[in-house]
Amino acid sequence: MQKEVVDSMAMKRALTRITYEIIEQNKGIKNVVLVGVKTRGVYIAQRIAAQLQQLEGTAIPVGELDITAFRDDQPLDQARLSTDYQLTFSVADKRVILVDDVLFTGRTIRAALDALMGGGRPQSIALAVLVDRGHRELPIRADFIGRNIPTARQERIKVTVNEIDGHDGIEIIN
């Protein structure tokens, strides 16, 4: 059973709130870069970047991070050990905003941090998520949250984005 809990307008408002919070906490966007976790985190990061550019008049870099080789639920193999740095820009001395769609156990973000560190030492790393659903297994928290949606552990959150799914929204799946 699926139940829509956030429609496209509410999702847009959540992303706008995240955008304003990023500007406020960073006192502007100087030295800020966004890095989206594949797949939906990339599209969310691109939307935030577009709003930041509209509000601040400056384009900021947006990177795409594939964390597959860094997941702790995959066997450690040569492919994982030889993974090259993926971003087209350095994160050294930058304020990195890591962007993902859903924060659940924290394991995806841990893998993203591992993947990110090949690009130099950032000034800081903050986490922006569209949905925080709780149930953390690691000591990871989001700095920017679009919506807190408490769920039962066995439920799933499905974020849909227009670029992939043809519409925006957030659903709980039992």
From Swiss-Prot:
EC number, as in UniProt: 2.4.2.9
Keyword Transmembrane helix: no
Motif PRPP-binding: chain residues: 96-108
Record-linked InterPro entries: PRibTrfase_dom, PRTase-like, PyrR, PyrR_bifunctional
Superkingdom of this protein's organism: Bacteria
SUPFAM superfamilies cross-referenced by the UniProt entry: PRTase-like
Quaternary data: Homodimer and homohexamer; in equilibrium.
Function per UniProt: Regulates transcriptional attenuation of the pyrimidine nucleotide (pyr) operon by binding in a uridine-dependent manner to specific sites on pyr mRNA. This disrupts an antiterminator hairpin in the RNA and favors formation of a downstream transcription terminator, leading to a reduced expression of downstream genes.
PANTHER family, sorted: BIFUNCTIONAL PROTEIN PYRR
Protein's name according to its UniProt entry: Bifunctional protein PyrR 2
